[in-house]
């Protein structure tokens, strides 16, 4: 009887204090409309403790977790201690059954997840321009940016203003006509219709099949039909595409441009240049070869074949690294990754080269993360520095590295211009493991941030190393290399890596391993290269050709490269006035504007990205279909980097270059390299009449372009004035704090910085025209005398040496002084 009394006590306590949770089959109860009486409810409560184990075993895991949470919360409300003890013991048993502790059997549906990707979402379309949380970089807060001037706002305001003026003018005209009277106006209209004042010179009023129409261009149209130029709307490169005539730069198609133009013969410079190139390629200096043999470590040929097509798991990487690779959907390593990762894990210096879009960033980030997993954690220390030539490339590398290190405790910091110095200093105080920076901002913090030390750096990476070794970055790179420890691992990567030992030896490499996946500087095999030739005398129509291509052929996901910032900005205004959605990217923009332009292009808000060579290196934007070169670049290496923005990671793409006579050398080298590689080379012929029509449209916008530029200039001046006012207010408000800060120092003078910038511009755009220097009066007089002598106005003026020389003229007797001297000598001998 004792057990029955205890059971009744428990039931009474449960009825008073314990609130029942809803069962798993509550929906069935409500659907059937069955309500339980009090007695039935008591019976269910009495038997609930016996059924709980069975319900917990049959219910799904998700529901069990919710029930446990509810039971735990209700358990605290119970007043009877005995009841709570029984419930807790029963819940522990249910949890043990849920955890699989009742027996040692393994679930038949269990799958071992190597990459650890079961609970983390795979990033299907991995893009290096997304923030770590998936948000857009343009939405991230930025400090220190200047107030931006939006060209689209200026153009839209001008359009709205013109529409308002036109509407106002129409209303005035309508009001004037109403005042004059409708009958009189109708009579005037009837008279004007009755007179034969139609201008038959207007082509729009004449039928296309009328007498004499099309006679002038009949031959040209026939040629165009034969060449297939009417199929220019096809994105697969229709028009006139001739793969066989690529190396001769389509000289046989002169008749398609103008029948009166004779087919030109081979240019003599082509043959001379080709001879020089062949000699330079065939004759490798023996001394340079000996230098390379002594400088580079011997290559291991046996490992190259065995490591082909292996997976990331074969590298014996740690599980957090494999999970990070799986989260961004990296499964099979690329050739450069297969070669680099094992060597980098050994701590050796590396000089690596591969085609654009082959995964060079992951090739050096993965071994760095693997080595950092085994670092001492007692004292936080900065151990890795990755240097990039541009801000965009540094931001992109930072995003890729942070995503790969999602499942680790490795910390990162990006030091690039355009972001707040104070925020970067606060991050550097925490001593992040990896620092991704541009050289200028890295040196700034190295000299002026007391919390930043480089004495503990163990790994140095130079991405786009050939650009970093050029004259524009030489001084900054030397400053960094002489400051950081010499006992470090150094890795250099680029698509166009140099082999010059004299340049590489400056970096302080120690017997580096040379990993050249593509040593011939080739393009992607999925890239189709097109060339549009401008005949001599048509260089001023270049913008017309570009507008035709962007309106008719390539209408979306296009990057257009320019040599100069001024030209890119001007074309950006032309595109806006013609209704083409475009963004620009160059060095004169603020960091906020630059990131916003890339984000708008990446998200498809704009169809065209007008950029300088700032975006030619390393920029990885998913889905770029076409690259257009407004003019050929300075060198073949820059051309490879430009066209490498498309056809990345196995995708297809097109590159179109608008080339004139001065661009012949670059086009010839590109065609030669493409044919040697087996790439698709195509010549596209554009109807000159169509190009002239677009060029005329652009020329008609000259006045409006100047007005937009003037309005933009005024807005910039206003923004500058506002900034100066704010600066003055801050100086007054925070005078003590500002004056107490130490002055920031730099290792170069302003003159040296200007010289370095000039050298960098020369590397990209070639030597500029000779700078104008004010001549002194002495130089002016010398030039005037030379011009007068050349014109024959005055004779040659004797110099001092001519005036002091003895005269050789004849005397009165007809004999010279030398004759007299010889006669005296002869008399002495007699």
UniProtKB/Swiss-Prot annotation:
Residues 689-735 form a coiled coil. Residues 23-42, 87-112, 180-192, 217-234, 241-256, 271-288 have a biased composition (Acidic residues). InterPro entries: DEAD/DEAH_box_helicase_dom, DEAD_box_RNA_helicase, Helicase_ATP-bd, Helicase_C-like, P-loop_NTPase, RNA-helicase_DEAD-box_CS, RNA_helicase_DEAD_Q_motif. A motif (Q motif) lies at residues 310-338. Gene3D superfamilies: P-loop containing nucleotide triphosphate hydrolases. Residues 1-117, 159-295, 757-830 are annotated as: Disordered. A motif (DEAD box) lies at residues 463-466. Its EC number is 3.6.4.13. Residues 542-689 form the Helicase C-terminal domain. The keyword Cytoplasm does not apply. ATP binds at residues 354-361. Associates with pre-ribosomal particles. Belongs to the DEAD box helicase family. DDX27/DRS1 subfamily. This is ATP-dependent RNA helicase drs1.
């Amino acid at each position: 009887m004792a057990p029955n009394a205890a059971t009744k006590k428990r039931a009474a306590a449960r009825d008073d204090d314990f609130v029942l949770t809803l069962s798993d089959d509550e929906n069935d109860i409500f659907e059937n409309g069955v309500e339980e009486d009090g007695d039935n409810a008591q019976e269910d409560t009495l038997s609930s403790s016996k059924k709980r184990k069975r319900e917990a075993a049959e219910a799904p895991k998700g529901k069990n977790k919710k029930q446990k949470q509810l039971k735990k919360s209700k358990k605290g409300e119970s007043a009877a201690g005995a009841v709570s003890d029984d419930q807790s013991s029963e819940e522990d048993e249910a949890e043990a059954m849920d955890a699989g502790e009742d027996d040692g059997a393994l679930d038949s549906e269990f799958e071992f997840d190597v990459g650890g990707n079961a609970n983390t979402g795979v990033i299907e379309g991995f893009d290096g321009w997304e923030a770590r949380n998936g948000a857009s970089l343009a939405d991230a807060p930025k400090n220190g940016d200047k107030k931006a001037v939006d060209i689209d706002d200026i153009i839209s305001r001008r359009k709205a203003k013109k529409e308002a003026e036109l509407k106002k003018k129409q209303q005035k005209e309508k009001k004037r006509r109403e005042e004059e009277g409708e009958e009189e106006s109708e009579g005037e209209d009837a008279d004007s219709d009755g007179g034969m004042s139609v201008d038959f010179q207007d082509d729009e009023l004449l039928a296309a099949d009328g007498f004499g129409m099309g006679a002038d261009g009949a031959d040209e149209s026939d040629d165009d039909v034969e060449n297939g130029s009417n199929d220019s709307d096809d994105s697969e490169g229709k028009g006139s595409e001739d793969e066989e005539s690529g190396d001769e730069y389509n000289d046989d198609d002169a008749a398609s441009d103008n029948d009166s133009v004779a087919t030109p013969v081979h240019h003599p410079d082509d043959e001379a240049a080709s001879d020089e190139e062949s000699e330079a390629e065939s004759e490798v200096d023996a001394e340079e070869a000996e230098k390379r043999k002594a400088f580079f470590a011997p290559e291991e040929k046996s490992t190259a074949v065995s490591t082909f097509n292996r997976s990331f798991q074969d590298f014996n990487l740690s599980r957090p690294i494999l999970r990070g690779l799986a989260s961004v959907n990296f499964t099979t390593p690329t050739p450069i990754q297969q070669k680099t990762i094992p060597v980098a894990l050994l701590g050796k210096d590396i000089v690596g080269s591969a085609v654009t879009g082959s995964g060079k960033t992951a090739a050096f980030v993965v071994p760095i993360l693997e080595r950092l997993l085994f670092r001492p954690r007692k004292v936080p220390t900065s151990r890795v520095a990755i240097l990039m030539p541009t801000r965009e490339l540094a931001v992109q590398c930072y995003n890729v590295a942070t995503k790969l290190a999602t499942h680790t405790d490795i910390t990162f910091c990006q030091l690039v211009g355009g972001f707040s110095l104070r925020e970067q200093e606060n991050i550097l105080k925490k001593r992040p493991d990896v620092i991704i920076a541009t050289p200028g901002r890295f040196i700034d913090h190295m000299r002026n941030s007391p919390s930043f030390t480089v004495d503990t750096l163990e790994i140095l990476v130079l991405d786009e190393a050939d650009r970093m070794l050029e004259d524009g970055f030489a001084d900054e790179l030397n400053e960094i290399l002489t400051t950081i420890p010499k006992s470090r691992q150094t890795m250099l990567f680029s698509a166009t890596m140099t082999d010059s030992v004299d340049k590489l030896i400056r970096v302080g490499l120690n017997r580096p391993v040379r990993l050249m996946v593509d040593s011939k500087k080739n393009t992607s095999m999925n890239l189709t290269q097109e060339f549009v030739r401008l005949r001599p005398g048509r260089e001023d129509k270049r913008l017309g050709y570009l507008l035709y291509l962007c309106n008719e052929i390539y209408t979306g996901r296009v990057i257009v490269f320019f040599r100069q910032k001024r030209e890119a900005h001007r074309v950006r205004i032309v595109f806006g006035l013609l209704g083409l959605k475009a963004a620009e990217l160059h060095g004169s923009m603020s960091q906020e504007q630059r990131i916003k332009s890339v984000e708008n292009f990446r998200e498809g808000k704009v169809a065209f990205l007008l950029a300088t060579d700032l975006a030619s290196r390393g920029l990885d934007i998913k889905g770029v279909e076409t690259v257009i070169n407004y003019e050929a670049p300075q060198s073949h290496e820059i051309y490879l980097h430009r066209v490498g923005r498309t056809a990345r990671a196995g995708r297809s793409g097109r590159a179109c270059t608008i080339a004139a006579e001065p661009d012949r050398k670059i086009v010839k080298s590109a065609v030669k390299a493409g044919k040697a590689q087996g790439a698709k080379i195509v010549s596209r012929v554009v109807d000159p009449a169509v190009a002239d029509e677009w060029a005329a449209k652009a020329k008609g916008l000259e006045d409006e372009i100047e007005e937009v530029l003037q309005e933009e200039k005024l807005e910039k001046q206003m923004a500058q004035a506002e900034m100066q006012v704010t600066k003055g207010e801050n100086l007054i408000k925070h005078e003590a704090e500002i004056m107490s800060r130490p002055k920031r120092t730099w290792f170069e003078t302003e003159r040296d910085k200007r010289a370095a910038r000039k050298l960098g511009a020369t590397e990209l755009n070639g030597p500029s025209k000779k700078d104008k220097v004010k001549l002194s009066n002495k130089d002016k007089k010398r030039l005037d005398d030379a011009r007068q002598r050349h014109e024959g106005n005055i004779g040659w003026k004797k110099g001092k040496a001519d005036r002091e020389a003895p005269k050789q003229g004849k005397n009165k007797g007809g004999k010279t002084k030398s004759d007299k001297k010889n006669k005296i000598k002869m008399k002495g001998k007699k």
